[in-house]
């Protein structure tokens, strides 16, 4: 017999401490010797001392995993050598197997340092069969349960085949040796047969094909130990339904419970009478306290809805199921939604049941949890179109439309997909003119496009894909179907949606140019093989890829995708991509190229990269405007009676074609002229406008004589819109003699009558585009406009419509309409004459007229009898043309500061529509970079607007600008703070800032801070506010209000930074303030005195702290309540309120007149103490040199308002 030679101490003690490394070394030596010994030759007594040492707590429960692993390896070797009698007591074996179970969990991580030792432990337990020692332990059943649980956990998470084999062998050994298999172990075992992954995979999927390793392990156990398990399986099926519920928890059900419900489903389908005493118990399960129980019951009953009629056979169970739609658990609500629609597939379902289910789905579209909303949308998407038509209402579908603007991205994406699918199914009804379907579904494309205002790139991309593939079906080879879908959608577009659609078409040109340049770079790059200029070519390719990536929601993926495409150097793919956006391509060529391109690149690009590539191809492809479509549009316009349903959409598309693709329009311009000639005086303004747009973009363009004669008639006797477009075409294309003849005809017949507005519209265009010919009669026209129109007043005061605040332009009385158009003619003369020698002499009285209109509230009549609507329109017109002149640097230099203040107060006009329309115009001009930076502060005056719509509109736009400038690292919006403080210091209410109006000025500044300032730019803004206190006001010397506002802004920034944890670090750079309004204080002592002085009162500080800590909505009420004189959208003030408002305004005017007696006799409505002071704001970007009517054109930059929000 061979004795164990190892005699060294392996147990650390207080007297004989051992380091961890020393213990590991000795254990390795011991393990090596034990492994080399044979069971037949070992002297059993020689290993007993080592056995006693190995079960010492200092080794078996050592904190080091390596020591525990090697200790257990030694122990299992001892079990091998001493088998069948273990050299350990039962208590020691119990401790050993507890540690073994813990250490075996390490089999999940094959990268573990001690994985080989753990593997050896498992292997020895299997081969030596030492695991059967567990059955002799007092708590053998508990050990068996833990082993089942551990091994199946390991199997689910993935192990090697050898590990699975050893685990199978060990479990089989235990099953065959133990006296009684515990129920808990059987529960674990049965659960694996179902799938072991949760209710969704288990209920109703007893023969699932998705069998993982855990299932395989369980199946093999049943196969190898079938005789032993047979009795337990029978007993389980007999007792499970009645005995298992007491062991259920709120978060987890037992596998037996799940399996029993699968059994119920099978019996319900094939033998429902066997469940007469079981199904009623589902009522209790559906209302059980445990969430897990309710989940299983909900899914079980939901799946049962597919067969038979549970609502009639078991009405109480059906009622309990419907009640789970409002379950407190999100998971239960989702499950109920997902399975409730099964009732709609059951032929036994009555109309009452179907209606009930539909109402259940509708109600969950507004659930408080996003997961529930997503689940509802997915479920609805799966319903048939007939179900929608028969059971859903327009209001229910509009609730789905509301989810397009959901705060959560996942909900928006699912709503986009669902609504697109619904519209696609409804198309045939819509094209057939089914009225009910039109009411139900026609709004969907419009709502989808309006999603662009959510300002999320991922959402935008989803809309574009769904519009292209489902709504408009751009990939359809049938031109007529494709156009019908396009016209049908446009027919029901809202104004917002139409604007987005046109901007998307406009953006297509940008993307096609970008991809065209990208392809050129790819060709030069030649897959990385270049002979010359390698660095330059590579840099160009990198730059264009960076630009493309910046327009994606996933720049990293986009960069990798287009880099991969370039490296492939597939010349055929380059050709196909070019053909998708070539204006020479027929649509069939475009379609064929797209399909071929996608098929070709799918072989090399991943699925994610292909999706990324697809969206850019869709954005650049000529889907809407291509040669095939344009010829079809012209054909449609030639037969208006036949195609009357799609006449307006086709006209709308044709109107924008010359703006976006003038070359394509040029091929059909003769056909457009023929349409105008054939229609005569009834010509559609949109068709004429399209020709007008083309004439402004096409050099040396001329029209046919017959077309010119028709346009001439329209200039004299058409509608205003017809005259406007016709006059533009004539001014650009016709001969000097033709234009002079028409001008003479108009001027000789100028008189105030019902036809004057049309002639004034014509004159306005002629002054703008052909000033040289009109200038000879300009003074005569101006005299007529001033004396016979502008100075023409109502004969008597008409109080009939005294309460009316607004009306559309078309409903204006003739006199007001003529005055508006007269102002337009005068301003257009100035716009055309900009830079000329006489421009200032001509412009001075016109600019003065605009200013007087603003100061006088639009009232020019000495009898004060101008109707409210007329005054409102005149104020709006004056402000609108002031902005036009400010966008021209030549005139901007000569518009004084007091006029600027007057313009700013339009944001606080008493009329809601004036404020709203002026704000829209202001935003557009700023968006196009046509106004100086000093006009940004006007937007923040909406902070105290009583109408939430105005404030929201301004807030959204400001935030979009902030986001845009941050992308380009532009500090424009931060610099605006200086202009805002300066403007507020000249606000008419500034004199009462220390009393009743302090909250207003806090609101202005807080509005700026809330919309512009963040943790990154707060140091810059704070620095600017401090710099203001080192400067003096150029406009009004001694203006200390600017310092009060500076301190107020600093305090607001400090309080907000403290509340939000922002760091107010010192800004390291020195920023120059705008020199035209603020200049450094020359005296050092004076500068120091002002800088150190606190200009705000303790009361103001308290108000600021309270304001910042108060929700915006609550604080807004405190400010807007004081502005009740501002007319809200749908609210009319009482007569007493109006009188009070007039008194306040008159008092304000009196005070301002006292400050500047030079203008006392001039009618005004706000501060004028800065009259005559001119400020040069020409450093800001201004309009292009080309003269154009902004309302006629859509600039390419317009898309930034949506794309860069």
Swiss-Prot record:
What are the TM regions of this chain, as residue ranges? none
Q: Which GO terms describe its molecular function?
A: chromatin-protein adaptor activity; DNA binding
GO BP terms, alphabetized: attachment of meiotic spindle microtubules to meiosis II kinetochore; cell division; DNA repair; mitotic sister chromatid cohesion
Q: Where is the composition biased (Basic residues)?
A: 1124-1133, 1140-1151
Q: Where is coiled-coil annotated?
A: none
Give me the stretches of Polar residues compositional bias.
1111-1123
Statement: the UniProt record of this protein carries the keyword Cell division = yes
Location of region: Disordered:
1111-1205
The answer to keyword Cell cycle applying to this record is yes
Please state the protein's primary subcellular location.
Answer: nucleus
> Locations of Acidic residues compositional bias?
1186-1205
Oligomeric form and interacting partners = Interacts with eso1 and hrk1. Associates with sor1.
In its UniProt entry, what is this protein called?
Sister chromatid cohesion protein pds5
Origin species: Schizosaccharomyces pombe (strain 972 / ATCC 24843) (Fission yeast)
**Lineage start:** Eukaryota, Fungi, Dikarya, Ascomycota, Taphrinomycotina
């Amino acid at each position: 017999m061979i004795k164990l030679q190892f005699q060294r101490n392996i147990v650390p003690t207080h007297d004989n401490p051992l380091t961890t490394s020393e213990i590991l070394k000795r254990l390795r030596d011991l393990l090596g010797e034990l492994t080399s010994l044979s069971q037949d030759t070992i002297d059993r007594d020689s290993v007993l001392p080592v056995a006693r040492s190995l079960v010492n707590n200092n080794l078996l429960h050592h904190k080091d995993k390596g020591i525990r692993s090697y200790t257990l390896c030694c122990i299992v070797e001892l079990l091998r050598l001493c088998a069948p009698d273990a050299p350990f007591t039962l208590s020691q074996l119990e401790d050993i197997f507890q540690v073994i179970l813990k250490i075996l969990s390490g089999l999940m991580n094959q990268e573990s340092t001690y994985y080989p030792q753990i593997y050896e432990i498992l292997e020895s337990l299997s081969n030596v069969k030492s695991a059967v020692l567990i059955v002799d332990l007092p708590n053998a059943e508990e050990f068996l349960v833990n082993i089942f649980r551990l091994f199946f956990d390991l199997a689910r998470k993935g192990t090697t085949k050898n590990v699975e084999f050893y685990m199978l062998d060990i479990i089989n050994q235990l099953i065959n040796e133990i006296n009684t298999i515990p129920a808990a172990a059987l529960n674990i075992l049965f659960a694996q047969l179902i799938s072991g992954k949760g209710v969704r995979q288990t209920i109703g999927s007893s023969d699932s094909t998705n069998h993982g390793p855990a299932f395989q392990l369980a199946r093999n156990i049943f196969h190898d130990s079938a005789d032993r398990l047979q009795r337990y399986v029978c007993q389980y099926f007999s007792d499970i339904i009645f005995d298992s519920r007491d062991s259920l928890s709120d978060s987890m059900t037992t596998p037996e419970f799940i399996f029993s419900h699968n059994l119920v489903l099978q019996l319900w389908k094939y033998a429902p009478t066997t469940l007469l005493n079981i199904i009623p118990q589902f009522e209790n399960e559906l209302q059980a306290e445990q969430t897990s129980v309710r989940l299983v019951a909900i899914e079980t009953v939901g799946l049962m809805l597919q067969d038979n009629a549970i609502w009639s056979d078991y009405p109480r169970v059906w009622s309990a199921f419907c009640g789970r739609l409002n379950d407190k658990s999100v998971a239960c609500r989702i499950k109920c939604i997902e399975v409730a629609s099964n009732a709609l597939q059951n032929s036994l379902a009555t109309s009452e049941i179907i209606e009930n289910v539909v109402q259940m789905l509708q109600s969950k579209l507004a659930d408080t949890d996003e997961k529930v909303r997503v689940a509802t949308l997915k479920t609805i998407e799966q319903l048939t179109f007939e179900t929608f038509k028969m059971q859903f209402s327009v209001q229910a579908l509009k609730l789905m439309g509301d989810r397009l603007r959901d705060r959560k991205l996942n909900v928006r994406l699912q709503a986009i997909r669902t609504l697109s699918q619904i519209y696609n199914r409804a198309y045939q009804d819509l094209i057939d003119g089914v009225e009910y379907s039109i009411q139900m579904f026609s709004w969907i494309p419009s709502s989808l496009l309006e999603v662009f205002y959510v300002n999320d790139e991922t959402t935008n991309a989803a809309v574009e894909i769904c519009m292209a593939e489902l709504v408009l079906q751009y990939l359809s080879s049938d031109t007529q179907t494709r156009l019908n879908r396009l016209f049908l959608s446009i027919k029901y577009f809202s104004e917002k949606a139409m604007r987005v659609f046109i901007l998307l078409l406009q953006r297509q040109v940008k993307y096609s140019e970008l991809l065209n340049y990208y392809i050129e770079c790819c060709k030069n790059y030649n897959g990385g093989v270049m002979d010359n200029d390698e660095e330059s070519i590579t840099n160009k390719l990198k730059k264009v890829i960076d630009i493309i990536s910046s327009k994606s929601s996933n720049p990293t993926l986009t960069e990798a995708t287009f880099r991969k495409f370039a490296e492939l150097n597939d010349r055929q793919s380059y050709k196909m991509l070019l053909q998708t956006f070539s204006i020479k391509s027929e649509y069939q060529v475009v379609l064929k190229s797209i399909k071929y391109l996608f098929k070709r690149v799918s072989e090399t690009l991943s699925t994610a990269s292909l999706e990324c590539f697809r969206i850019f191809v869709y954005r650049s492809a000529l889907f809407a405007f291509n040669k095939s479509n344009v010829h079809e549009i012209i054909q449609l316009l030639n037969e208006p009676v036949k195609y009357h349903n799609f006449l307006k959409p086709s006209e709308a598309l044709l109107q924008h074609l010359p703006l976006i693709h003038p070359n394509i329009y040029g091929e059909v311009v003769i056909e457009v002229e023929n349409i105008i000639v054939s229609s005569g005086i009834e010509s559609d303004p949109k068709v004429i406008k399209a020709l007008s747009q083309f004439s402004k973009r096409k050099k040396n363009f001329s029209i046919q004589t017959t077309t010119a004669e028709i346009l001439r008639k329209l200039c004299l006797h058409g509608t205003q819109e017809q005259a406007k477009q016709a006059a533009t075409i004539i001014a650009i294309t016709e001969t000097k003699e033709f234009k002079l003849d028409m001008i003479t005809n108009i001027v000789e017949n100028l008189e105030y009558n019902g036809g004057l507005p049309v002639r004034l519209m014509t004159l306005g265009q002629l002054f703008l585009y052909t000033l040289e010919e009109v200038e000879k009669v300009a003074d005569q026209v101006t005299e007529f406009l001033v004396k016979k129109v502008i100075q023409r007043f109502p004969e008597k005061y008409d109080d009939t419509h005294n309460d009316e605040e607004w009306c559309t332009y078309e409903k204006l009385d003739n006199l007001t309409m003529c005055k508006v158009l007269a102002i337009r003619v005068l301003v257009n003369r100035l716009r055309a004459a900009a830079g000329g020698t006489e421009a200032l002499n001509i412009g001075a009285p016109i600019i003065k007229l605009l200013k007087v209109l603003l100061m006088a509230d639009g009232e020019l009549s000495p009898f004060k009898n101008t109707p409210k609507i007329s005054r409102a329109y005149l104020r709006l017109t004056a402000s609108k043309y002031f902005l036009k002149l400010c966008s021209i640097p030549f005139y901007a230099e000569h518009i004084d500061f007091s006029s600027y203040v007057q313009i700013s107060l339009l944001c606080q006009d008493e009329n809601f529509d004036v404020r709203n329309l002026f704000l829209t115009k202001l935003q557009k001009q700023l968006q196009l970079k046509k106004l100086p930076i000093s006009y940004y502060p006007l937007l923040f005056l909406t902070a105290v607007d009583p109408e939430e719509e105005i404030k929201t509109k301004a807030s959204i736009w400001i935030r979009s600008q902030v986001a845009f400038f941050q992308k380009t690292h532009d500090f424009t919006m931060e610099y605006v703070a200086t202009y805002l403080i300066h403007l507020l210091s000249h606000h008419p209410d500034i004199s009462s800032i220390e009393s009743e109006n302090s909250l207003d000025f806090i609101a202005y500044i807080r509005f700026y801070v809330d919309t512009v300032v963040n943790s990154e730019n707060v140091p810059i803004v704070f620095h600017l506010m401090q710099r203001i206190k080192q400067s003096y006001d150029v406009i009004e010397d001694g203006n200390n209000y600017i310092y009060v506002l500076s301190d107020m802004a600093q305090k607001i920034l400090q309080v907000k930074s403290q509340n939000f944890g922002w760091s107010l670090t010192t800004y390291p750079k020195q920023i120059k303030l705008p020199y035209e309004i603020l200049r450094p204080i020359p005296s050092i002592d004076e500068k120091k005195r002002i800088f150190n002085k606190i200009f705000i009162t303790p009361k103001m500080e308290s108000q600021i702290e309270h304001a910042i800590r108060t929700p915006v909505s609550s604080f807004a009420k405190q400010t807007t309540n004081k502005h009740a004189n501002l007319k809200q959208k749908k609210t009319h003030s009482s007569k007493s309120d109006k009188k009070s408002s007039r008194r306040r305004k008159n008092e304000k005017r009196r005070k301002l007149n006292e400050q500047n007696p030079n203008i006392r006799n001039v009618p005004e409505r706000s501060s004028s103490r800065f009259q005559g002071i001119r400020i040069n704001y020409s450093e800001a970007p201004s309009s292009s040199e080309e003269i154009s009517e902004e309302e006629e054109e859509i600039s390419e930059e317009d898309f930034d308002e949506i794309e860069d929000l």
